[in-house]
Design a protein with these regions (language model features):
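The conserved cystathionine-beta-synthase
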Residues: 269-291, 295-297, 315, 327-356, ...
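Short helical segment in ABC ATPase nucleotide-binding domains corresponding to the A-loop/adjacent helical element
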Residues: 102-110, 120, 124
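Helix-to-loop junction immediately C-terminal to a conserved catalytic motif
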Residues: 57
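Conserved ABC ATPase signature
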Residues: 140-145, 149
């Protein structure tokens, strides 16, 4: 794993009280976020999660306590200087409509006085990193991009000056569910490379479980209800409030803690149009993991399933004979999302593909079910079953 380039962020009894308010918006929040981890702030409306995040870059000034980045109090720097050293991604992206994509990405380096050659090199590097080839995207304008593409530019812009800390305020909340899952997976893949310290705000507990190395659950009045890893929170909710907020299906939510890459993938019987039917029948009958062949194109991208009925007789396989719609998932897809996708498939199998949609292997509903039934170790060091109860010793 790459070395973390993030910084330790610590809240020390951080408080925000607005004039005339009966209670503080954030009440003596204390927690420490290790360098290179994603900490998700989650809770109901009015719990102070966004306020807590904005106190880090002082878009909202704290009225008590301290917030430090690698031991340095955020109040010790001028606010503008502080913000230029912290990445910031918001739900509506906030790109300048009259700037090109390259200019939007390079805003902070430009403010920091970088020369043009260095800015161009950095923007091209980041656009490539977020999956937007610079030759194709750098001279476009925001209105020429899809919502998902604009959000990728927002992430690239936040990384432009290589900040140790990134703040993300419901960054994927404004896109449709399919694009949202893709963006989540892409960001997790990116985080494995850049290892920033990320403070991520969401109201969605499922997103918190998927994205967070640690989760801070806040309740109304800005009170910290629990701060721990997703696995520990699901195994041992600290209070009735946390248990209600996480929901009754804690066992199913545990599937969000594991990803497709954590499973042993099945080996597909990959075929191309024009291959001999008899040879494919032989391969399917020779100890294959599955009863279906997977038709792929010349780039090894899935086109559909071929079953025994399609293989009757002799001669070459016709691409039109394949049953289209083989569901695809990525290695970063959570097992919960994968299960939801696979349950809509008549063959109960999903095709695992890379970022270029090339086949890596297959995942089955049965394999996900086995993972769901397996006990997990909670914060108390004991194994817990799918309902959070202490599992019997084997």
């Amino acid at each position: 794993m790459p070395e973390a380039t993030g910084a330790v962020v610590a809240f020390e009894r951080a408080t925000k009280r607005y004039p005339g308010a009966d209670a503080p918006a954030v009440n003596e929040l204390s927690l420490e976020i290790p360098a290179g981890e994603i900490c998700v702030l989650v809770g109901p409306s009015g719990c102070g999660k966004t306020t807590s995040m904005k106190m880090v870059n002082r878009l909202i000034e704290p009225t008590g306590g301290r917030i430090t980045i690698d031991g340095r109090d955020v109040m010790s720097l001028p606010a503008v200087q502080l913000r230029r050293g912290i990445g910031y991604v918001i739900q509506q992206v906030g790109l300048f409509p009259h700037f090109t994509i390259a200019d939007n990405t390079g805003v902070v380096p430009s403010l920091l006085g970088w020369d043009r050659a260095r800015i161009r090199e950095r923007t091209d590097e980041l656009l490539e990193l977020v999956g937007l080839p610079p030759a194709e995207y750098r001279d476009r304008y925001p209105t020429e991009l899809s919502g998902g593409e604009r959000q990728r530019v927002g992430v690239a812009r936040a990384l432009a000056a290589d900040p140790p800390v990134m703040l993300m305020d419901e960054p994927f909340g404004a896109v449709d569910p399919i694009r949202r899952e893709r963006l989540q997976n892409e960001f997790l893949r990116l985080q494995e490379r850049v290892r920033k310290t990320v403070i991520f705000v969401t109201h969605d507990v499922d997103e918190a479980i998927k994205m967070g190395d640690r989760i801070a659950i806040l309740q109304r009045g800005g009170i910290l209800a629990q701060y721990d890893t997703p696995a520990a929170i699901l195994a041992n909710p600290a209070s009735e409030f946390v248990e209600r907020f996480v929901g009754a299906d804690r066992g199913l939510k545990r599937l969000s803690l594991a990803r497709v890459r954590d499973l042993q993938l099945l080996e597909p019987v990959v075929v191309h149009a024009g291959e001999d039917r008899a040879e494919v029948r032989r391969r399917l009958g020779a100890g294959a993991d599955v009863a279906y062949a997977l038709l792929v194109d010349a780039e090894r991208r899935p086109l559909g399933w071929i079953d025994q009925h399609d293989l009757r007789g002799g001669g070459p396989i016709d691409a039109a004979a394949a049953t289209p719609g083989a569901p695809t998932v990525e290695p970063e897809t959570t097992l919960r999302d994968a299960l939801s996708t696979l349950l809509g498939s008549s063959v109960q199998l999903g095709v695992v593909v890379d970022e270029r949609e090339r086949v890596l292997g297959l995942v089955s509903v049965d394999a996900i079910g086995d993972r769901l039934r397996a006990p997990v170790r909670g914060a108390d060091g004991r194994l817990h079953d799918v309902d959070g109860e202490v599992a019997a010793a084997s």
